[in-house]
Every structure is written in C-alpha cells, then in structure tokens.
Amino acid sequence: MKRILITAIILVAACLRSNAQVFILGDNVTTGRMSRIEGTVIDSLTNEAIPFASFYVIPAKDTTISNFTLTDAEGKAKLEDVPYGDYTLRVEMLGYKPFVKRKYFRDRVADMGTIKLQVDDKYLEAAVVTDVGNPIVVKKDTVEFNASSFQVGTNAMLKDLLKRMPGMEITDDGKVKFNGEAIDKLTVGGKTFFFDDQSTALNNLPATIVDKIRVIDRESERTRDTGLQDGNREKVLDVALKKEYEKGWFGNAGLKGGTTFAGGEDDPLKDDRGLLYSGNVLAAAYSEKDQVTLIGNGMNINDSNGVVFVVYGAGGDRTRISDFGAISSAAQFGANVNTSRIKNFDSTVGANYKYGDSRSGSKSFRTTFQEDGNILSSSESSSRGFSNSVSANGEFFKEKGKVRVRISPQFSYSRDNDFNNSNSNTTRDGALVNTSQSNVHALGTSKYATSFNSLNINDLWGKKNRVLGFTFDISHSDSEGETQENSLVKMRTKDESKSLKYLNDGRSSNVSGQILYGEPIGEKIIISTTARLAYNKNNSTRDAYDASGFNDYYSSESHLRGLSQSYNMTAQYKFTDKSWATLGASLNGDLSETWSKSFGIEETTGEGEWYWHVAPVLRIQHSFGNNRIGLNSSGFSQRPSQSSMLPVMNISNPARPTIGNIYLHPNGNTYFSANWHNNNREKFSTLMLTLYCNIDTRPVTYARWYDTDGILYSIPVNSRKNRVSGSVYTSYTTPLDGKARKWFLTVAIDGGIANSTSYQTKGTLPGINRETFDYSSFMESFWGDASGNRFYSGKSGFNESSTITITPSLYPSLRYTSGDFTGRINASFSKRIARYSLDPSLNMNTTDSSVGAYASYRTKHEFEFNTDLSYNWYNGYSAGYGAPEWQWNGEIAKSIKAFTLSVKIHDILDQTRNLTHTVTANYEEDTYSLVMGRYILFGLKWNFGKMNAANSQKAQNAAFRMAF
C-alpha cells in the first residue's frame, strides 16, 4: 500500500512538472545512469570566450528543455545529471547564430569540446548598438536588454535584475523608472500582469526565467485605437521569458521573520509590535495561448512593497491602507489569467482577496499667524483600521484590424472597521485656551462595480483614416455602516461633550457616453469632433442617535444630481509619421443640483445653474533625429465633492469642526505643457525638459477662523482670483565611460512657482453654538446672498490673502555597475519659499537636504551584500522638529541551490523619522508620523518548478528508487 501511494504521488509530481513531455521509466532512472555534458563557447572571429550563453538540451521528439545552464566568465558550461538518451544540444547568445547538434548521450562525461558561435550579421544590422556581445540593442522605439548579460544571484527576483541594468530604477513605492521616466505598464510576454500592480511582478518573478527586458515607447491606447493623435505616449516594460519557460510552470515561496528592537527611549511614533513576519508564494503556468498566475502573501512588514492594499469607497474612490506614515499588516490571495484563445482577442481576468490591518500615528505643532497674537496648537493622533476586500477585474480587447473593441469590467466588495483617537491643546500669549479629546469608531461595507467599454471602427466605409468611435462607462456603488463619535472640549468659559452614533447609507451611480468621428481631408488632414454626456446621482443619509434615541438635529440627508457635457472639435495635420499638429477648442458644461436637509432645515442649491468653461486645444509633436518636441494645451471643468457641499457641521474633531458650503461652484482648469526629449541611443544618454503651466478658474480654497476659545473653524469657498502655477523639470542621464556603460550620471532639476488666494481673519471671530446652530442663519451672516456678497466684500471679517510659493529642487546621482557590484551616490536638496501679501513678516524659508550611498555586491560563492546609508538635515522648522538623522540599512543573502537565506537590519542607528512640513497663507505646521524604526528580519526563499529542472529530476529519481 505504501509503495502504491508513493508511486501515485510521483506520477502526479511528474505530470505537474512536464507540459508536452512523456515520462518513461527506463534503466537510466532505476540504475541512476547519468551523463555530464561539458563544453566551451567562444567567438568564431576573435576566439574570445562568450559568457552567459544559454547551454541546454531537449529530449528528441520533445519540445521541453530538460537541463539548462549558462556559460561562465571563461565560456565554460556543464550540465549535470542528464539521463542517458537522444537529445538536441543548443547553444544560444544574443547577436550570434545558434549552435544546434543532435546526439545520443550514453557516456558518463560527454565533452563537446570548443563550440564556436558565428556572429549573426542580419540581427546586428537592425540595432544601433553593434558591439559583439553588447547586452543592449536599440531598434526604433524599443530598448532591449539581454538578461543573461547582467549577473544576479541564483534566486534573484525581477527587481534585482532590473537594478543592474543601465538606466533602470526601482522607486520606494514599487514602481519602475527608466532613464528618469516612469514606466506606465508592466507586461509579461506582452500580456497584462496583475493589472497595474508592478510590485507583484518585481517581487515574485524569478530573474532566472527572464530572457529579455524591453522598454517600449509607444502611442497612447486612444491613439492606437482611433488613429487620432492625443499627444500622449506610454512607456511599457515587457518581460520576455526564456523559451523553456514559455511552456510549463514555475514558482517560488518565501518566509521571513524577525523583531523590532528600538532604543531605550519610549517613542510612541516607533513601531513596538515585536514579532515581524513576511511570507509569500507564487505559482505560474504558461503556454502559447494561456498564462495562469497564483499568488499569496501575508505580512506585517512591507519590506519589499509586495502588497498594495486598495479599498473602493462609495463613490468609487480608491484608498490605500498602506499610506505614508502607516504601519500595515496585510494578506493577499490572487489569481491572474491571460488567454488569447478567443480569435483576435486578448483577455485578462483577475481576482483578489485582501486583508489589511493599518496603524498610524502623528504628532503635530501648528502656528497660526494673526495680527492680534499668534495661536499655537499641538496635537497627537492614533488610528487603526481593519479591512477585508474581494475584487475581480477583467479586460477584453481587440487591438488589430479595422474594428477595435475594449471592455474592462471591475467589481469589489469591502468591509472596514476603523478606530481613531486624537487630542490637542491650544495656547495664545502663553496661556492655555482649550484642550480636546475625541475618539471615533466606524464600521462599514461598500460595494462597487464599473465597466469601461469602447468600440472604434477605422477606415469606415472603405475610406482610409475615417474613424467612428463610441465609449460607454457605467458605475454604481453602495455603502452603509455606523459611526460612534465621542468628544470632549474644555475651554476657559465652558466644557462641551458629545456622544453620538450615526447610521450611514450612501448610493452613487454614474453613466457617461461619448461619440467620436474623424473625417480625413486628403492624406494629411483629419477633422475630428467628439461629444460627451455624463450623468451622476449621489444620495446619502446620516441618521444620528444619542442617549435619548433618534436625534433629528444632528441627522442629515442629501441628494445630488449632476450633468456634464463636453464638445470638442480639432483639425490634425500630419507632416510625417512622427510629426503632426492638432488645433481646436473644447466647450465643457457642468450642472450640480443639491437637495439637502440638516439641523431640521431643507435647502436646494444649483438648480438650473450651468457652469461653462471654454479652452483651446493645442497638440504638436515634431520628431527629428534623436529629438522629440511636444506641445499640449487643453482644459476641463470639475465639480466640488459632495461632502464639501453638505450643510452640516462635522464635529468628529471638536477642536477643529468643518462646515459644508452649499454655494460652491465647479472650477475650470486650463493647462499648457511643452516637452523636449533627446534620446541618444548610440551614447545611451537621455535629456528631458518639461514646462507646465496651469490656470485654475474659481478654485476651491478654505476660509478659516479661530474663536476666543481657540476653536478652529473651516469652510470651503471658491476663490475669486485664479490660481496660476508653473513648473519646470529637466533631467539628464549619460554614461561617463563611453560604451563600457559602467558609470552613469543623472542630474535632475525641478522648480515650481504658484500664486494662490485664500481667506483669513486678522483676529478672532465669534464662535458657533453647536446646540442652537442654524445653517441658514449662519450662511446669511457669513456668506450673504447666493453670490457671497458679504463674504467677498469683507463684511463677515475675512480678508483676501495672496501667497506666492517657490519650490526649487536638485537631485544629482552617480551610479556604477560592473559584474557583481553595483554602487550609487546620490543627493537631494529641496527648498520651499513662501511670500504673503497680508503680512510679509511671516515669509518663510525651509530646506530639506540629503546625501546617501548604496552598494550591492555578490561573491562567486553566492553571497550577496546590500547596504544603504543616508544623512538628512533640515532648516527652518519649528522648535523640536527637523533634527538631523542618519539612516542605515543592511542585508546579507546566501543562495544554496534552490534556496536563499537572508538577514536584514533596517535603521541600524535607530534615527529614522517621518517629517512633513505644511505651509499655507496663515499657518505653518510640522508633523512627525509613525515609522517602523529599527528591526531585524531573517528570511528563507525557495524557487521551484522548471527553474530547478535538474534538482527536480534528482528528487523524482530518488523517490522512484524508494518506491521500487
């Protein structure tokens, strides 16, 4: 019975391992007769060794690679434990013709001698870079990296491979940049991989399976579908798998554990949880038409950006639980399926379950500037949120032929449980004005569904470049839950306490459609027009309860109905395939009607009031040589959020209540951008220059005031003056050692200037009695008529203040990569300058500076050492904030066949802080937020499947010997 059971297990394992392969029991298995195949690979012209060439065998009458290796630095290769039999030996290297030989191996040692590879002239003619053995090939708008030319550890992941490639960068939030430009989409074999979550591929795809990395600069999705240039481009990083992994399966599993160990001081903004863990597993099966990927993660430390937790709210808003300043525990189970079995269609379906436990904390100090005496306030807050989410995504598209179709549905369900605690105190002239405490517990569920659909018909009725396109979007969300709010405010004259429970219910629906038509005039001109209509409806109720039961006074209800319409007409002239110009105009209209009831009073606003915004449309692109110049100008309108228009007072933070404004209007936005890209592919250098200007018409800002008890009130208002801003960004990346490309210098300069308007008081104003608050009476005194005549004239005590903010920054970086070593030295200098019209004596200057270094080294014995060190210092911050700090992290890893052992120490000196600085027209605030602090983490990772074919074969042979 035991032998039968073992035999069954072995047969199942063999089936999982093989794809188009038949497993035959023969004397080579039962007696252990194996061959060792050796060879040396050299260049046929120079007789120099060729390292990193693929050296593998395929059993006769089969298509699956059974044994695989790469040549070493001397061009030598060795395949161990090849069962006796008939095989095809293949040796391949980028830029060379493949070597192919069929042979029956039945010797203990089969020495293939010296194998000379011939240069493939046809392949090299397509590339700008033509050096023999060069790991980089550039053709048209694609940069291709040969993965075998970049040395990484045996069990390295995709992110480790990318870090060794010239121009590649992995950001702190798990995104990829190439030569300073963000990668918009990451695909595997040309297919979507877990939608927009790049970190899943970076942290889970083994580098061993990668054949090539391609960075593709292509036109936007809309341009590809319609043929009409929209001025946008996207950068795609495509991971091409080695042939032996295009069919079959592979995977990896990892586990890490450790603990926090902060210094002796008791710091509430340092993680004190103790035990830390992180585990993940990935399994993938690939065939010519299908890709199936399964992942699982569980962790309470996101040391690899492996999980991004997103929650969809009632309006479809996406919220990350792992925001900056939060410590998260998370679990994820997901599946992603790509298939091209439907003729002419590519399909992607994904499903995810995610759990999150997020903790955050902060400590802030704010100075509010007033003529009759500054107000100082300090606050501390802590929160914890639990969330469970289930989501499913789909993408079905056809990008070839005259008819293009795209359907993208999405569904999600989430349940949240949040706890928030805060306290604050306010002083003036050295005297305590008030203290406050509050705690909030919110429990809720939300359901969200949406679908984006498009249909484009090109060359309509047989006329080239005539296009007719339709898009249709629909979404719906439901949310419900309950909130318990408790608060206590102690003032000089009185104390106020509240204990209320709210039952919340929200419904939101959105429907929009667009039609596009393009008519060619001759071969170079296309006249196009679009019309878009959208309708949205938002209903929400908030029933309040106190110790006596239902409280109508604090209950509220609102119904919002919105309509928007947009019309666009342009003329596009095509100079060449890469140079064109588009001129036109757009007309946008918004209608927002709101019925609301709060404090026992009903209000209707915005009825029949359309807001119209006209903007020019300018899009120009001109390409010549290595240069591309683009100009872009357009505009849009945007309605205020529903919560900002509710006629209610939010007292969840009793020391800082907020009030909605039913008279808010939509704001318009007109922008202009210009960019110049110089991409010298021969030198591998990139120069980018971008200018951006923006004009906000009637932007939403805030009016804030303190009362004599130090309570800070806020209400959103439209500014009468436009907000004008501009920015410039330039980046230059170049190798310093010619074609060797080991040394890379990057210098980035960023600068911005903005002129904005806000409304503030010169001193205190009367407070609001929350027990007798009447919204209509308050707005009549504060706002006046519907146009805001009292507020804008200054009769309610507010003055118009203009603020000019200037933000210059400099980011130099020097990187060195050679074989097993990668190093980087970088610095950053950011300055914020604020100038105020009401009181120039309050003008401010702050500076954030940082210098740092990073190094990674891998030894021939598969040890890998990684460390980074930085020093940060600050100027212009409040007392007690902005202390300089050292940040030092280190990691050691050791690969042993299919396993990797690692130990990582984060924040070795225990000095890391999370500091933010906020400057507005009338206050300055410094905030420290919760950070992980110092911790140690031990890890074990195992790669399984095809990538360890020889080891898997050994295990199977041993099992068969035990069974028989």
Where are these predicted regions, by residue range?
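A short, solvent-exposed loop/turn motif at the edges and junctions
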Residues: 59-64, 86-102
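Short Pro-Gly-centered beta-turn/loop motif in secreted/extracellular proteins
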Residues: 51, 78-86, 94
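Membrane-proximal, glycine/serine-rich, low-complexity loop/turn segments characteristic
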Residues: 20-34, 74-76, 90, 97-99, ...
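Outer membrane beta-barrel strand-and-loop segments of large Gram-negative receptors
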Residues: 378-380, 512, 554-556, 566, ...
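Signature of Gram-negative outer-membrane beta-barrel scaffolds
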Residues: 526-623, 836-837, 842
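Short, ordered, surface-exposed loop/turn motifs in non-cytosolic proteins
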Residues: 37, 45-60, 136-138
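Outer-membrane beta-barrel translocator domains and adjoining extracellular loop/strand segments
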Residues: 226-227, 264-268, 296, 305-313, ...
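Short, acidic Ser/Thr/Gly-rich low-complexity loop/linker segments typical of extracellular
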Residues: 60-76
